[in-house]
Amino acid sequence: MALRTKNPNRQKTEAIESIKNDVKASSAFIFTEYRGLKVEQITELRKKLRENACTYKVVRNNFARIAFEDADIKDVDSWLTGPTALAMIAEDANLAAKTLFEYAKDAPALVIKGAVVDGEIYDAKQIEAFSKLPGKKDLIAMFMSTVNATTSKFVRTLQAIVDKGGAQGAAPAEAKAEAPASEEKAADTPAEQPAESAPEAAPEA
């Protein structure tokens, strides 16, 4: 009895559609060669990338080529040679690039060929330089630190103005408090007696 086998053309179509869907769902792609990596290493790398919203997928070059052509992404054919695995990134390409280059330090068999980030083409050197830049999370942290420092400085300046105004405001209050005392002292002092009238002149003879 002959075993039923899946239609190879259908398998091909499904594989291409799967890559197409991944391409549509991603904003960046990093092309790598995994020749020489062990299965457990690929599994470990996938796990690390998944933490950064990145899928690491081994692809057939001709299928990937069709998917990228369909998405109108050009100039990637030179990277679709040899054993190819794609890092397909939904969010922060910088974090995924950092992860790949950090992993490659301990696993030199992993080769980063190039990347497409937001429609821009990066060769191997450019994507490595990109990986060394601060990521979105780092930039947000730096921004918040600057905002907090500026706010703290503003609050201190405002408090200094308030404190200075309070010191100046105390002087008029003290002056007002002294005024009644002065008036009271003046009231206790007897008024000067009017000078005695000069004697009337004697009538002329």
Curated annotation (Swiss-Prot):
Give the matching CDD domains: Ribosomal_L10
Task: Write down the Gene3D superfamilies for this protein, in alphabetical order.
Answer: 3.30.70.1730, 6.10.250.2350
Locations of Low complexity compositional bias? 169-180, 190-205
Return the annotated region ranges for Disordered.
167-205
Specify the superkingdom. Bacteria
GO CC terms of this entry: ribonucleoprotein complex; ribosome
Query: What InterPro entries does the record tag this protein with?
Result: Ribosomal_uL10 (IPR001790), Ribosomal_uL10-like_sf (IPR043141), Ribosomal_uL10_bac (IPR022973), Ribosomal_uL10_bac_type (IPR047865)
Q: Which Pfam families has this protein been placed in? A: Ribosomal_L10
Q: Which UniProt keywords apply?
A: Ribonucleoprotein, Ribosomal protein, RNA-binding, rRNA-binding
Q: Name one GO biological process term.
A: translation
Single GO MF descriptor:
large ribosomal subunit rRNA binding
- Signal sequence, renumbered to the chain: none
Q: Which HAMAP family match?
A: Ribosomal_uL10 (MF_00362)
Identify its protein family: Belongs to the universal ribosomal protein uL10 family.
Quaternary structure per UniProt?
Part of the ribosomal stalk of the 50S ribosomal subunit. The N-terminus interacts with L11 and the large rRNA to form the base of the stalk. The C-terminus forms an elongated spine to which L12 dimers bind in a sequential fashion forming a multimeric L10(L12)X complex.
Q: What this chain does, per the record? A: Forms part of the ribosomal stalk, playing a central role in the interaction of the ribosome with GTP-bound translation factors.
What is this protein identified as? Large ribosomal subunit protein uL10
What broad taxonomic lineage does this protein's source fall under?
Answer: Bacteria, Pseudomonadati, Spirochaetota, Spirochaetia, Spirochaetales
